[in-house]
Amino acid sequence: MSLLDYFRAKKEPTTATTAKERLQIIVAHQRGERDAPDYFPAMKQEIIEVIRKYVQIDSDQVSVQLDQNDDNLSVLELNVTLPEKP
């Protein structure tokens, strides 16, 4: 094994690293839900109902997140997995 092969080799992430990354995602998601306004769950449900008027989807195919910055700026992020056309 040469010295160059050592630097080129990609190291596989350990299970501990993967678990840590997943936990960070879960904690960030829960913090976001905790800081969301009271009307957010109802608004999310209404958005899903409007999408269902036009496309047949499951609730788990819709992701709605509210990101809030310190600059009093809120961003509503909506991700919808749409079915393919027949």
Swiss-Prot record:
What stretch or stretches form a coiled coil here?
Answer: none
Explain the purpose of this protein: Prevents the cell division inhibition by proteins MinC and MinD at internal division sites while permitting inhibition at polar sites. This ensures cell division at the proper site by restricting the formation of a division septum at the midpoint of the long axis of the cell.
Matches recorded under InterPro entries: MinE, MinE_sf
Q: What is this protein called?
A: Cell division topological specificity factor
Its GO biological process annotations read: cell division; regulation of division septum assembly
Cite the entry's keywords alphabetically. Cell cycle, Cell division
Q: Which family does it belong to?
A: Belongs to the MinE family.
